[in-house]
Amino acid sequence: MYKRQPLSDALYELTDHNYCFVAHKEMDAERKNLGWGNDLARPYTYSAADQEVQMQLNDLDVLIAGSFPERQTKEYGKKAKLFFRYSERILKTGNPLLKYPKRFFHWHACNPPWRKAYMLCASAYTAGDYAKFGLFRGRCYKWGYFPETIRYPSIDDLIDRKAKATILWCGRFLGWKHPDDVIEVARRLHDAGCCFKIEMIGTGEMEQQLKRQASEAGLLETNIRFLGAMSPEAVRLHMESAGIC
């Protein structure tokens, strides 16, 4: 919800308030600590357990389904006149041959070819991943996150204010996001005699490993700073001042 609030606000108004956002589960503690989820109470937000929302789901026209229980997604998808799924890439860790048959049957069971469903791709790789299983070909659309749009008086002034040798990395410290590549980039820049500063925003399972690598390279605090978790608003301020994001 936190990534799609502006879009949800717009859909709520465009449909004359005939839009609802159904949350299957509460936001996890990690994201709440980042400041996400604050001020998200909206007249169109419901919990999946609410009886009122069950009535709306039984009389829907369009369904956009993300990380929702598959049994209920199938049930409501049959009732919808227009059915979209949205997804990030599904093969983040590759597609080993031994896992292919199981994945093929699972995703075809979730998305039978005779059901007219469309895919909203929240990654540049989503369409290609599903195409490997013969799914959603010709029925994929670009999708993404929808943060608030801020109109700056002058983009040129904003660029001029940026710190020229500052690099910002923001995300969860997970293996498939490869934050360790940033440490390697820093090491190469340092060896080349470059003057630079890298700020890393986020938390995750690789945090201690990354700090250790930065320390072993002699770059911790001097060239690389770990800023921890912060709210989306604070992240935007850092992005406004960084030369490279």
Kindly label every feature range from the protein language model:
Residues 156-188, 199:
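Conserved donor-binding/catalytic core segment of Leloir-type glycosyltransferases
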Residues 51-71, 84-85:
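Short N-terminal targeting/anchoring amphipathic segment
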Residues 24-27, 170, 174, 197-210, ...:
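Glycosyltransferase donor-sugar binding loop
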Residues 91-115, 120, 149-151:
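Nucleotide-sugar donor phosphate/pyrophosphate-binding loop at the beta->alpha transition
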Residues 211-233, 244:
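Nucleotide-activated donor-binding/catalytic signature segment of Leloir-type glycosyltransferases, i.e.
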Residues 47-49, 204-207, 224-238:
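Conserved active-site histidine-acidic residue motif and adjacent donor-binding/catalytic loop
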Residues 114-162, 166:
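Donor nucleotide-sugar binding/catalytic pocket of nucleotide-sugar-dependent glycosyltransferases
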Residues 76-95, 120:
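Active-site proximal beta-strand in glycosyltransferases
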